[in-house]
From Swiss-Prot:
This protein's pathway: Metabolic intermediate biosynthesis; acetyl-CoA biosynthesis; acetyl-CoA from acetate: step 2/2
Name of the protein in its database record: Phosphate acetyltransferase
Segments traversing the membrane: none
PANTHER family found in the cross-reference section: PHOSPHATE ACETYLTRANSFERASE (PTHR43356:SF3)
Main enzyme class: transferase
Amino acid sequence: MSVIDIFKKRLQAVSKKPVIIFPEGWSASVLKAVEMLNESKLIQPAVIFHNRQEIPANFDKKITHYVIDEMDLTSYANFVYEKRKHKGMDLKEAQKFVRDPSSLAATLVALKVVDGEVCGKEYATKDTLRPALQLLATGNFVSSVFIMEKGEERLYFTDCAFAVYPNSQELATIAENTFNFAKSLNEDEIKMAFLSYSTLGSGKGEMVDKVVLATKLFLEKHPELHQSVCGELQFDAAFVEKVRLQKAPQLTWKNSANIYVFPNLDAGNIAYKIAQRLGGYDAIGPIVLGLSSPVNDLSRGASVSDIFNVGIITAAQAIK
C-alpha cells in the first residue's frame, strides 16, 4: 500500500476532517487540486485570494475562502506583532505581514483557525517556510523528508530540502524527526543509515567525524536501536547486501536500510533527484517535520496530482 493510500485510510477514519489552507488562490493548478480534495471528502480545503477579481466564475463558493482585500486583518496583525515583537517586528510590519497570502495562511494555522497549510506552487520555498518558522517553530530543529516509493518499496531520504549544512547535533535531530515520522506510518522494521563517503572507518576527515558523532548522539538517546542504526556508511553498503557483507561484515542487517540520513543538503537533494529520474522512484515531499502544525512546501513544478497528494499528507499530519 502506498503512503498516500495509508494517509487516505487514516483520513477516512476520522469524523472531523482537517482544514488545510491553500494560499495561492490565483493558481489554476492549486484550485483544481482544491476542487478534487473537496470532492474527495477526506479534508476540508480552504483558499486565500488577494481580491474578488481573482476568484474564477466556476469556483465553488461553498469551499471556505478568504479575500484579503475584504478582511479586517487587525486581530491577525496584533497576534503576529505580539508573537514577533521580541524579534524587532513593529505593528506596521505585522500589518504588512498578514496582507501576504502565505503569511496570512501561517497566521491562520498558528491561531488554529485551520489545521495546516500547503503552499509553494507560486511562492519560492523561502517565502513559504519563513512565515511558518516565524510563527510555528517549537524550538526544535526543523527538517524535511522525502518518501521514495517504487512498487512496494518505501525509503525515507532526509534532509533533501531544508538543512543546508547541519552539524552533528542537527543531523541527529534530523534523524530523530524522520525516525518518528516513519514510526507513525507503522513501519514494521526500521534500518537507518547515516551516510558518508566512508564506511566504518574506511575514510578520514571532518565530514566523516561529523557523521560518526551524529550517529553516536542519536544512539545515546535511543540505545535500544543499536542493532537498527549505523553510521558512518557509504550508500552502497547501506543499500546492497553483497557490498555490506564485504565492507561492513560486522553489520548483521538482514535487510537494507530504509532511512537514509544525508550529511548535507547537496548530497540529499542530488540523491533524491537521481533516485527519481534514473531509479524510477516516486518522490513524495518534501514533508516538513518539527513544526507545531503541518506546513508543506510544493515544488513550483508540482502537478495537480502532486498538490492533491501533499494536501492529503498535510491533513494526515494534522490528525492528533
